[in-house]
Amino acid sequence: YRLKEGRIIRGLRGKARITINLIEYNIYPQTIATFLPGSIIELLEFTPDCDFQMIAADKDFLPLLRGDQLFESHTRQNLVTQVTDTEWKLSDAYFTLIWDTVQEVPFRREVVQHLLAALLHNIKYIRTEEANDTSRRFSHQEEIFWRFIALVNEFSKNERTVGFYADKL
């Protein structure tokens, strides 16, 4: 399934095995996953007790950022992140506050936009800290692989030759 909107998912219970843009991931409890607009998602399997919370937002919903930057900071290997207890509690507070605000009448668009932007910035901060952990650095081969996957996801509708991707790498 190709997503039209970006999504933020919190794994609450159980386990799910998914592919995001050809890469397989496992989502467990206390996991946060972000999916870019245009991502290709496939649910491979899930346990009977699997439960998620999800926020979906059109790329044009956050005018304070350029539409193509909505989930920009969550590309490549940082799509799925296991978080600490403190980070998990904070993400729960964001989800609850966003949900409660969405239910208000009249709809408070700007408030929801800024809360969502704050949540995305917090996820970016968590992942930046994770990326700075030198024990998690990628090999040169892994970096090339991730660049290749990103190129396929960006150009696969129009480009289908190996030569095109080889030139880009």
Where are these regions (language model features)?
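Repeat-unit-sized solenoid/scaffold elements
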Residues: 44-52, 56, 119-136
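N-terminal regulatory/effector-sensing and dimerization cores
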Residues: 1-74, 104-105, 109
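Juxtamembrane/interfacial segments around transmembrane helices
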Residues: 57-62, 87, 166-169
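Short, flexible active-site loop motifs that bind/organize anionic cofactors or intermediates
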Residues: 20, 52, 78, 102, ...
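Amphipathic alpha-helical segments enriched in hydrophobic/aromatic residues interleaved with Lys/Arg
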Residues: 73-118, 122-127, 150
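Short, Lys/Arg-enriched, Trp-marked, Pro/Gly-tolerant hinge/linker segments that flank
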Residues: 82-85, 105-110, 125-169
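Short acidic/polar alpha-helix capping motifs at helix-coil junctions
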Residues: 3-8, 41, 65, 114-116, ...
